[in-house]
Amino acid sequence: MHKMQLQLFAELIPAAGKIKRKWMAHYIDAALPSANKADYSRLGKDLEEYIVEMNANVETRNNIWGETSVNLDSYQPQASTDPYYAEIGEPLFDRLQGIVDERQTLDDLKTSVVEVHLWDPVEAADGTYVAYKEDAIIEVSSYGGDTTGYQIPFNVHHTGNRVKGKFVLATKTFTADA
């Protein structure tokens, strides 16, 4: 597949070479689970790093012949968003504050996350990129903060149903591939 040179946010994305961190975009659905439509917010504004830990389930065995076998049978991905500075009017703040205020649990914490590969545009669809959507749970780890502002750090636990598709930046919409 031929990769074209693409300009995004007034910066040219190279057709080859190392990928800058900002080209891997992470979005979380800030809408309530009962909402009819997703409301994706991009993560990272106040973050110096955002790492999805894969947490592989690995079993290693040694047999009596001295051989080692390794089985990796699943992943339990999760990521930490710390700090998250609350901003009035931001849908993600409203969602997180609702979790704090109402001490929400179980299905009230369900959401979805989308990882968007900004280095991988969908040809013939301007502003559309290859993306992966996955179900997740939001875990607010604490709230409060210091003099820098009100903070609601949270963890995102990926729960499966990973689907490949396309993400349109202008409308923040995900469409699964057929």
Segments predicted by a language model, with ranges:
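A generic alpha-helix preference that emphasizes hydrophobic side chains
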Residues: 6, 78, 153-154
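Structured catalytic/translocation cores of nucleotide/phosphate-coupled proteins
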Residues: 26, 105-107, 151-153
